[in-house]
Amino acid sequence: RGLGDVYKRQALYWQLNDNWPVASWASIDYFGRWKALHYMAARFFAPKAGYIYTEGTKAVISAANETLENQSLNVTVRIRDVELNVLFEETVETTVKAQSSIHVLERDFADVIGSKKRRVFAEAVYTWQDGTTSTEAESFVPYKHMDLLQPQIETSVTEKDGTIEIQISADCFAPFVWLEIEEDVIFSDNCFDLTSEETKTIYIQKEDVLSGKVLSADNVRKTLKIRSLRDTYEQ
C-alpha cells in the first residue's frame, strides 16, 4: 500500500485461519468464526480504501485504488471531539489512478486541536464514483490515552426477506464497536468506529449463520451484546 513502485506494494497477511481449536493469531478460528482482525482486514484490503496516519498534531489522509480503472473520489475530512462536535471540515475532490495510491490531504491541525489532543480524532468519509463509501477514523494519541466517554448505544433490529438488519448509533465517539449474539454468525461488518450520530446498518444473511438456532429479529434482539473500546477501561 506504499506510494512507491507498484512492485513494492505487496503485503503479507499472517494468518488467515486455524486447523485446530486453540487460541491463536489467526483471523478466522477453527469453527469459521471471524475475529476482529478479519473484519478489519476486509476493510484495509478492499480494492478501494482510505487511510489516516497521524503524528503529533499532523494528519495525512490517503486513498488507494487497486482496480484497473481510474477512480474519481470525494473525501470529506473532519476533526471532531469525542462529543462529535465538528471542529474542522474540508472536502477534497480528486482522482486516484488505477493501481495507485495518493495523499488526499496533509495538514498540521495544531491550530484546531489546541490543548484537546486527548479528546479529538480525525474522520475521513470516502465516496467513490461507483457510490462505494467508507469512513476512517484515527486519534492523535494512543487510544489508551484518549479521554473517551461511555457511549450510549441505541439499536433497532428488524427482519426483511430473511435478512436481519441491525441499526446502530451512538451519542459520542465509539471506537472498535463489537457486536455479538448467542448464535455463531458472520456480520456484514464488525469492530468498527461510530464517528457521528448517523445510523450504521449491519446485516446478517441466512448463509452467514454458522451454527445455532434459525435466526429471527426476536432472537437477535434478546441476545445482542454491544461493546466498544471504552468498556475495556477500568472503572
Where on the chain are the PLM-derived regions?
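Flexible loop/turn segments at secondary-structure boundaries
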Residues: 18-24, 59, 70, 82-86, ...
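Substrate-binding cleft/loops of secretory-pathway carbohydrate-active enzymes
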Residues: 14-34
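Intrinsically disordered, low-complexity Pro/Gly/Ser/Thr-rich segments with frequent PxxP/GP/PP motifs
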Residues: 78-116, 184-212
